Amino acid sequence: MKHHKSMRTLGRERNQRRALLKSLSASLIEEKKIKTTLARARELRPVMDKLVTLSKKGNVNAIRLLYAKVGRDNAKKLVGEIAISYKDRNGGYTRIIKLNPRKSDGALMAQIEFV
């Protein structure tokens, strides 16, 4: 039964799901916006909000956690550029825009981007 299971499985096991979200978050940090399925975008949103909140702290421990989550280059970009632009904002750092369904399989698509 699905009692108190807040996360979608995205058709993957736990390690694969973590790797997928790590890859999507790294891509979003690099590109500022990415196009993906709606379910993946909805799962990525809270992950990115937590990463941006963590990067706003800016202390050594937070930066080391960011290194582990998104890699060294992306962590530096997150702390150096993105966190500074959101210093006065308390959450809601990303927006999801629904797009037309994918032609091949009809999957609902969305664009997730920084506000």
Per-segment meaning from a language model:
Residues 1-12, 19, 23-115:
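Structured, basic alpha/beta domains of bacterial-type, RNA-associated proteins
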